[in-house]
UniProtKB/Swiss-Prot annotation:
It is an enzyme of class 3 (hydrolase). This is Probable endonuclease 4. Its cofactor is Zn(2+). It comes from the Bacteria. Keywords: DNA damage, DNA repair, Endonuclease, Hydrolase, Metal-binding, Nuclease, Zinc. Binds 3 Zn(2+) ions. InterPro entries: AP_endonuc_2, AP_endonuc_F2_Zn_BS, Xyl_isomerase-like_sf, Xyl_isomerase-like_TIM-brl. The gene is nfo. GO terms for biological process: base-excision repair. Zn(2+) 3 binds at H182, D229, H231.
Length: 285
């Protein structure tokens, strides 16, 4: 079964997110459990936690259908000790919030060396950060997202993801999320079925499908191998419809959240309906 949805707003409180997902016909969703552009957030109260869990039950969302995302401020590979500690503390808090809400996944961007560390040293620092956070929390898997490779961001090569996983001690609590726009911008072609098969065979060889915990389904305004992160609506960018149809028909992508972060929330319901139709080969674009 495919779990298909979008990154919905948690404005007004996390308990509002499940209903917003249900309104667009989603069978999965992503959210921020706090303001993603602030370091601090009010603690989750028992009432808020209960409301969120009740809303998930009401709308039929289990933990495996929900892919929370951490704050954009966090850099688990930061070269400066003070900033690194701040990021690590924030990441631990994000994992703890997910656990409180009964969630089992937390999607994060690996980190940036800021031109002050080698790639290898930064990847090791990221893995160390993950180990520290997993040691201080329970029940939530840290899900590394591939990046487009803008600036000094790491995670744009499958080898980066594998290097982090290799150094994480508890392999049962680490996974990856593949963003199609990021992969395309990083030089992994997806424009034809043959491209998809080649790219994901490479992913399986280097990382392994056993670590795939989620997907971000985004077309790209950015050009191939540009290392620029610019999302677009499905079929309107430089990737096209083909990979999204292909993903819907492959069992490797069953039972994980498949999340839209496309640029027009007004058509998310249409994009979700189109994706659902591709599972049986219907609704050609």
């Amino acid at each position: 079964m495919k779990f298909i949805g979008a990154h919905v707003s948690a404005s007004g409180g996390v308990a509002n997110a499940p209903a917003r997902a249900a309104e667009i016909g989603a069978t999965a969703f992503a959210l921020f459990t706090k303001n993603q552009r602030q370091w601090r957030a009010a603690a989750l109260t028992p009432a808020v936690i209960d409301e969120f869990k009740a809303a998930c039950r009401k709308h039929g969302y289990g933990p495996g259908q929900i892919l929370p995302h951490d704050s954009f401020l966090i850099n688990l590979g930061h070269p400066e000790p003070e900033a690194l500690e701040k990021s690590r503390a924030a990441f631990i808090d994000e994992l703890a919030r997910c656990a409180q809400l009964g969630l089992t996944l937390l999607n994060f961007h690996p980190g940036s060396h800021l031109q002050q560390l080698s790639e290898e040293a930064c990847l090791s620092r990221i893995a160390e950060s993950v180990n520290i956070a997993l040691d201080k929390t329970e029940g939530v898997t840290a899900v590394i997202e591939n990046t487009a490779g803008q600036g000094s961001n790491l995670g744009f090569r499958f080898e980066h993801l594998a290097a982090i996983i290799d150094q994480v001690e508890d392999k049962s609590r680490v996974g990856v999320c593949i963003d199609t726009c990021h992969a395309f911008a990083a030089g992994y072609d997806l424009r034809t079925e043959e491209d998809c098969e080649k790219t994901f065979a490479e992913f399986d060889r280097i990382v392994g499908f056993q670590y795939l915990r989620g997907m971000h389904l985004n077309d790209a305004k950015s050009t191939f191998a540009s290392r620029v992160d610019r999302h677009h609506s499905l079929g309107e960018g430089n990737i096209g419809f083909t990979p999204f149809r292909w993903i819907m028909q492959q069992s490797h992508f069953d039972n994980i959240p498949l999340i839209l972060e496309t640029i027009n929330p007004d058509i998310w319901n249409e994009e979700i309906a189109w994706l659902k139709a591709q599972q049986t080969g219907g609704a050609q674009a």
